[in-house]
Structure formats: structure tokens, C-alpha cells
Regions:
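Long, structured stretches of catalytic cores involved in phosphate-ester chemistry, encompassing
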Residues: 1-184
């Protein structure tokens, strides 16, 4: 009998697999062409091999270890975008959820891709089966309201960080149920 309901892990890196979507090969994202022409050859390419995507065996070992826990929630940062994912091991066993915190002031997708940011976000969701949602347009933070039965995850943003005059934007909200993958 376990005395706890949630296992919450904090780390700076995203742990769920993130592959670059095929959209990066298109002319729509011409600002990235030179880098992407060198990197993409039609295969699934991890977004960042200097993070967990570069260490898939070690990620599986970590998943195996935490699979013995209840309701795993991985809190991550340092990607400068907001991410929300279900996590599954290589045998498609549900491991937990990942909450990737946004940047407060660092550059993100929105700073790189401008008007094409929503297209990039959607392409990431389509390319990555376990990725529920990504937002690279806004700066802010994430908060968790933890109860015995669920965790409410709220991504909170402001309209700009470049001025003292800003508007608080409507939060993006997810409810994580105990020991269940997120489903909308």
C-alpha cells in the first residue's frame, strides 16, 4: 500500500521524445533553410540530441524506475516553450505526464518563427504522437494545483515582456487525473 498519490520530478530538460516535424523542409520556414538543409534527410530527427532525445536507452531506464511509482508528473524547463505530453515507454506503457514550463523572457518559437509560430506548433503536435500541446508564442509560467484525485496545470502568460504595459492572457489549462493519461 502506497502512502502517496503523486510522484513529481523536477528537471531542466524535456524527457518526452520530440521529433522535428517535416514542415522544416518546406519553403514556408525559409529563415531556417540553411540549418535544416544540413540536418534533415527525410528521417525522424530528434529536436535536441543534447537532451533526453540523445539518450534513449537512459530515458527507458529512468522510465522503468519511475514506472513503479504512482501518477508520475515530470516538470521540465529550459526549452523556452510550453509543452504538455503523455509519456509512454518503448512498449507503449503509460509512464506519466510531462509539463514543460515556458520562458519568462528567453527567446522561444515565437521569436524565431514570428507569424509562422502556430504552424510550427501544430506541426510538432502532428509529428509527435504523445505531445498533446505546445505553445511557443507567449512568455509566462506554469502553476500546479495538486489534490488527491487530480492536478490542475495552468500555463499563465502575458501579452508582452518588453513593456511595463501588458495584459494577462487567458491561461491554457489541463487536468491530470490520478494514474491516467491525459485525454481532451
Amino acid at each position: 500500500d502506497k502512502e502517496y498519490r503523486w510522484s513529481i520530478f523536477g528537471q531542466q530538460l524535456l524527457i518526452g521524445p520530440k521529433y522535428l516535424p517535416g514542415i522544416f523542409k518546406s519553403e514556408k520556414l525559409s529563415s531556417s533553410r540553411s540549418y535544416l538543409a544540413k540536418q534533415l534527410a527525410g528521417e525522424k530527427l530528434p529536436t535536441n540530441t543534447d537532451q533526453w532525445d540523445g539518450y534513449p536507452v537512459e530515458r527507458e531506464k529512468f522510465y522503468e524506475t519511475i514506472s513503479k511509482s504512482q501518477s508520475n508528473v515530470i516538470l521540465a524547463g529550459d526549452s523556452h516553450n510550453s509543452w504538455f505530453s503523455n509519456l509512454y515507454d518503448k512498449n507503449n506503457n503509460f509512464i506519466g505526464v510531462e509539463v514543460g514550463a515556458p520562458a519568462i523572457s528567453s527567446p522561444s518559437f515565437g521569436d524565431t518563427f514570428g507569424e509562422q509560430t502556430q504552424t510550427v506548433e501544430q506541426a510538432f503536435v502532428e509529428e509527435n504522437d504523445d505531445l498533446i500541446w505546445v505553445n511557443g508564442r507567449y512568455k509566462g509560467y506554469v502553476s500546479l494545483d495538486i489534490t488527491e484525485e487530480h492536478i490542475d496545470v495552468s500555463f499563465k502568460y502575458v501579452s508582452t515582456v518588453k513593456s511595463k504595459d501588458y495584459t494577462a492572457l487567458k491561461p491554457s489549462f489541463f487536468r491530470v487525473e490520478h494514474n491516467k493519461p491525459f485525454s481532451s
